[in-house]
């Protein structure tokens, strides 16, 4: 990691406003920030979008969308789950799994190219290109479920997300999400550039 830290330090000396380098350098230095720069997340997934599904599903046998869907359906044995907002919906892998169990499905994501892939799956009633917190601040949050599948590892401090959903959703909607675990208190920025969270 020493060579990488040196490279990003040099990059910041040349371009002090290089936010992506700041984030990676913080991760490599063991410094935990509240959230990554939006441009870092957007560029990361814009670049990943064309091969995202093949990389996760085919190569890594990614199963979290299916597991989350099965858990929700099992704990809510009703004919329809009602309306669902897929936070950080990406290419729509969770949407594919849960579409048949809900009456309305909407998705929001920071990466426009990921949303293009999600649109090709034809499972969402509406897709919105927006930062997650901005969306929660401004849009109607009248949903029965909020799902965030491997999204919060790119958020960090979740307090604002939790607060907005609780205060702006008046229909008692439930939030279901996955995280990567840490034994440290609160949340921690790993060297991978992703965040881990404690209970």
What do these predicted regions represent?
Residues 85, 91-135:
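Class I SAM-dependent methyltransferase SAM/SAH-binding core
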Residues 172-179:
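Conserved beta-strand signature within the Rossmann-like core of class I S-adenosyl-L-methionine
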């Amino acid at each position: 990691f020493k060579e990488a830290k040196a490279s990003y330090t040099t990059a910041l000396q040349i371009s002090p406003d290089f936010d992506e380098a700041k984030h990676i350098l913080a991760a490599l230095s063991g410094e935990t920030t509240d959230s990554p720069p939006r441009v870092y997340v957007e560029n990361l997934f814009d670049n990943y979008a064309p091969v995202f599904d093949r990389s996760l599903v085919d190569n890594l046998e990614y199963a979290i969308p299916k597991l989350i869907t099965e858990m929700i359906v099992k704990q809510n044995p009703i004919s329809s789950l009602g309306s669902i907002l897929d936070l950080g919906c990406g290419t729509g892998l969770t949407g594919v799994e849960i579409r048949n169990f809900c009456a309305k499905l909407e998705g929001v994501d920071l990466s426009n190219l990921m949303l293009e892939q999600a649109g090709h799956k034809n499972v969402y009633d509406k897709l919105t290109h927006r930062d997650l917190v901005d969306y929660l601040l401004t849009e109607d949050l009248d949903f029965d479920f909020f799902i965030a599948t491997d999204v919060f590892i790119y958020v960090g401090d979740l307090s604002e997300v939790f607060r907005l959903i609780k205060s702006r959703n008046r229909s008692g909607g439930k939030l279901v999400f996955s995280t990567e675990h840490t034994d440290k208190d609160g949340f921690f920025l790993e060297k991978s550039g992703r965040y881990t969270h404690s209970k």
